[in-house]
Amino acid sequence: MRTVKEVKVKDYILDGKKIYIQSMLNKRSDDIEGSVDQAVELEKAGCDIVRAAIPNMEAIKLIPAIKDKVNIPLVADIHFDYKLALAAADAGVDKIRINPGNIGDIDRVKQVAVTCANKNIPIRIGVNSGSLEKHILERYQAPTAEALVESALYHVKLLEKFDFENIVISIKSSNVKTMIESYRLAALKCGYPMHLGVTEAGTERIGIIKSSVGIGSLLCDGIGETIRVSLTGDPIKEIYAAKDILKAVGTVSYTHLRAHETLSDL
């Protein structure tokens, strides 16, 4: 059985003993009321962790607004601007998702790591097949599992260089086989918790099929601490699909069963 390094996200412990369901808000970041309402509905549906895109400083207002209305952990999704990560941490977010390769030079990554360490905020390193570093892509000629894992582990080592080990990893691909191979390879090389998902999963039917195969296979291997079934449209359906996957592989907790619904109930 894989030994998982314990990471705490608000009140949750990611240690391999329980699987947590995650979803992402899809309202405009300037629609604070709509975003808050959606977060509330996701929590009611059984979502354990909710993620919100923070594309600009104005969107930082989302963080206290959402945290005031829901009890589940809130993740800030940050791209390109390290200052957004710093502001999100100051605003009280529970976890930050970044790709260290696209937020600037090493000094900026260090500032994010130091700030998050001081506030005990975990960082999810989010690597996906569509945003591999150019030099890695040139070496492998394609976003292979080996290329994706090399990128993820480089960023892990970068954070570790700054004495930051409060890390969660995601290595996503729209190709299900590549996604499975990537996580299996990464699981052999490091013990950090892993967030499972298939990027660009697509429409509801195709998205559920791809996510079920990818996420389900890895859960059966004992890999994965949080999961997200990425679907277009209403994110509530992501929760129902995730519950069905957990039930199918026999890892549903009482919490998930209590709120369980299937897509046929919609």
Task: Report residues per predicted region.
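Catalytic alpha/beta core domains of metabolic enzymes, predominantly
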Residues: 137-254
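Active-site mouth loops of central-metabolism enzymes
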Residues: 19-33, 75-78, 138-147, 202-207
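Alpha-helix-loop-beta-strand connector modules within alpha/beta enzyme cores
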Residues: 59-76, 112-120, 186-191
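Conserved, mostly hydrophobic/aromatic
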Residues: 21, 77, 125, 169, ...
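N-terminal small/glycine-rich loop or linker at the start of catalytic domains
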Residues: 8-27, 62-64, 124-140
